Structure formats: structure tokens, C-alpha cells
Amino acid sequence: MSNRDSSEHGDSSNKIASNECNEATKLGFNFTQLWSQITTTYSLIDRNDSNMFNRDERVESEQEKKSVVILGKKYDDISVDDGVIEQDIYSKIWLTYRTGFEPIAKCLDGPQPLSFVQSMVFNRNPISSTFNNFHGLLDNDNFTTDVGWGCMIRTSQALLANTYQLLFLGRGFSYGRDRSPRHDEIIDMFMDEPRAPFSLHNFIKVASESPLKVKPGQWFGPNAASLSIKRLCDNVYESNGTGRVKVVISESSNLYDDIITQMFTTLNPVPDAILVLLPVRLGIDKVNPLYHASVLELLALRQSVGIAGGKPSSSFYFFGYKGNDLLYLDPHYPQFVRNKTSVYDTYHTNSYQKLSVDDMDPSMMIGILIKDINDYEDFKSSCTKSSNKILHFHPTSEKADRRGSLSEFKRKNSEFVCIESKDVQRREDFITIDNVSRDDLNNMEGFIDMADEFDSEIDQNNKDDNFDDDEPVNVSQTSIGEEYTSTAGSRP
């Protein structure tokens, strides 16, 4: 943005602000402070866009000449600028912050809606989103925007929406070139209104129930997101709605052949597909380098539906990679809720960003779409051949060691996840997850970081006398119906 453009932009913006300021003052809202924050940080937002790929403003490097992978489809020897790739990315469904939707009541002991006003200055169109939802910002009792707290919900919606698009429209679907009523039906399922099965409202509703008890305005983690997706998909499945997708959640990344087979052969009605969700933590502060290749390998498989994750307190939807750079869609772009004559285009974008796998936060939710038994066998074979270090396959769930094979080693560098079966209130769901503070870790044995399996030699040579390796890990397990979970890997 040039200095002249910035000046003109600032002048017009200040005129808009002055028109609204009198009304805000009458209503007792301190708009002056908010506006000061918006104008002083606007240049920061421009600088934050430096990683964004645009058609007209790019200098191609040797790194960008490598092949590009987008949800299992590989483009060799084609510039990332190529129109074919851009159209493929544009066809992916993009979920973002929204403003001005039907109010969601706050909890008395939960976050306050106005406490998130200041976070608007860190989003890419703070001015328009602020004024479009101006009256909503003055409502102390309801949320009318998810700015500042809903990014994990949005990336989870994106993962699920692209799952449905892949399942019912195929990998070759091109939005804009191929117009399909089914595409619009999929988007309708994610509208920000209570009647839409996968709306923000319904994500919050099912997450507010036991055991998660997430309140409106609170951030979701991968576990809360995966359980919310399961509950919502179960509701659609049981109502014989469009797209009967069964969800399997595996915190330990263990998959059991007999359970997958049973789901495809005994459930009535037969599911159109199984969505495997892996809410995992692959390191401490960043993804352990031992998992870098495995993360990329999963995105390269045709069963991949992406990853919801990113950086601490900022979730992105990862749909592919180029070299060691992950490509993602950013939900931190507030859009006003519009009427349906123009809404569908707002769920697609030409803009995408990149993040080095070295800088990726270790906490994420990985999505895998399995269409039938043969598809599962193909997926299993691909992971086995590549020696994928994230997923583990077992022929049967009855004799599998759900604690993993790591109990003989110390677990020092991970958050401990405790799963208590007594907390189960809905039999089809797995149960609450209680994080133990790091202050308590020195007195606890049994920390499990999946990377320790490959660091065992170092671990053996650097024994810590504060840990008693002979003491067994005391973690209760739960396996309910077709869903199975484990604490064998470190999880958020």
C-alpha cells in the first residue's frame, strides 16, 4: 500500500468513524479508544499479509518451482502461480469469522462479548467488520460475532465442508466452472443460523454439553472440535439427512481393522463414508522434526481432507504443501452475514498463505476420509509403505495395547491427558479431558510424547532420578461402540 493510498484510506476511514462516533457516545460506548487501536494497527495488518500469495505481486523462487500437493493431488513442474492450481485452491471451501449473525447468549460465568472488541484490530478487514456489526458490539448479553475466539471452529467447519464436497462432488469439482446445486446445499449446512446442522451455533451447542462444557466465547481445542464434529454428524446420520458420515476419533492415532470393517458391514443404514479425526499433539512447542515428513505424507494421500491447526491461539485450514511450506486458508477475515443471493462466493477465496512445517504448532486435528473397505486398505497400505510415524494400524481392538509400547521410557516433555470413564454421560462420546498443570509434572510419571519412541536411546542415556520408571502408568481407558480413544500420545 503506497503512502498516498494509505493517506486516502485513512481520511475516508476517519470520516466513517466520525459519523458513527456520536451514536456510540450516546450509548455509552468508548469508541474513541477502539478507533485509535484500529488506525494505529492497520499498517501492521498490511505487513502481516506479506506471506500471502497474490496473482500479480510475487517473485518466484527456486522453492516455488517444486511440485505442489493439494489434498492428495500432485502438480508436477507447474508454477504455483498456474491457473490450474489457483482454480483448485479457489474451489476449496473457506470458512471465516462472521459478524451480525443471530445472537448466541453468553453464559453468566463465561466470557463477555465486549471483551473481544479489541481483538478486531488484528484481523484483515477490521473497519468493515466493526461497522457492519456495530450494534452487536453494544450487546453485553449476546455474541453476534466470533471474531477473536472462533477460528478453531471455522477451520473445523472447513475440514468438514471439504469432506462433504469431496465425498459428493468428487476431487475434480471446480467451483465457478462447475455449478452444482449440491455445492450450495453443502454450504447451506454451514450457514450461521441455528437451523443449519453444522452452524457455529450448533458447534457451540454440542460443545456446551457434558463432558466438554465449552462456553460461548471460549476457544476450542482439537479435542473439543473433533467431538463436536462427531456429535453433529451423528445427528445428521440418525435423521437420515444428506450425507451419512460416521466419525471415528482416535487421540492415540491407532486404527483397528476390525472396527472399520464392522462399521461398513453392520451399521444400518450403511454410512456413505467414515471420517477419521486425529486430535493429536506432535511435540512440545513445535512439531517434532521426526513428524515433518509424516504430516506432509498424510496431506499427499487421496484420503486426506486437511488439517485444522496452525499457531498457538490461531487455527488455520491446511490443504496442501509446496516443499516444506504448508499451504492454508486463513479464517481470521471477518465477513458480514449476507443474504443467499451473494453468500456462496464468500465461501471461496483466491488468497492462500504458507507456513513452514518447522513453525507449525504441534496441536492439530487431522482429517482422513474413508469411503469403503477397499479405500481403507489402500490408505493403510500407503501409510505402511511410507512408514508413517503418526498413524498405527492394528488387526483387532481386543488385544491391542492401547497404552502404546512406550511405558518403559520416561515421558518428560508433554502435557498429560487424563481420560476418566466415570465422566461419560453420553455413551456414544468419549469423555472429558483434564489437563494437569506443568507444575505437577515433576511428581507424575507417564508422560507420553510420541517422539520419545524414536528418542529412546537418548532418553536411556540421560536418566532423571526424579522419575521412577518402575511405577506403572495409571490411566483409565474408554472404548465405546464404534469409537475408540487412547492416551498413548500426548494431546492438548
Curated annotation (Swiss-Prot):
It catalyses: [protein]-C-terminal L-amino acid-glycyl-phosphatidylethanolamide + H2O = [protein]-C-terminal L-amino acid-glycine + a 1,2-diacyl-sn-glycero-3-phosphoethanolamine. One of its GO terms (biological process) is piecemeal microautophagy of the nucleus. Residues 454-492 are annotated as: Disordered. Its main location: cytoplasm. Its EC number is 3.4.22.-. It is an enzyme of class 3 (hydrolase). Keywords: Autophagy, Cytoplasm, Hydrolase, Nucleus, Protease, Protein transport, Thiol protease, Transport. The keyword Protease applies. It comes from the Eukaryota. It is found in: Cytoplasm; Nucleus; Preautophagosomal structure. The active site is at residues 151, 330, 332. One of its GO terms (molecular function) is protein-phosphatidylethanolamide deconjugating activity. Residues 474-492 have a biased composition (Polar residues). GO terms for cellular component: nucleus; phagophore assembly site. Pfam families: Peptidase_C54. Cysteine protease that plays a key role in cytoplasm to vacuole transport (Cvt) and autophagy by mediating both proteolytic activation and delipidation of ATG8. Required for selective autophagic degradation of the nucleus (nucleophagy) as well as for mitophagy which contributes to regulate mitochondrial quantity and quality by eliminating the mitochondria to a basal level to fulfill cellular energy requirements and preventing excess ROS production. The protease activity is required for proteolytic activation of ATG8: cleaves the C-terminal amino acid of ATG8 to reveal a C-terminal glycine. Belongs to the peptidase C54 family. This is Probable cysteine protease ATG4. The lineage of its organism: Eukaryota, Fungi, Dikarya, Ascomycota, Saccharomycotina. The gene is ATG4.
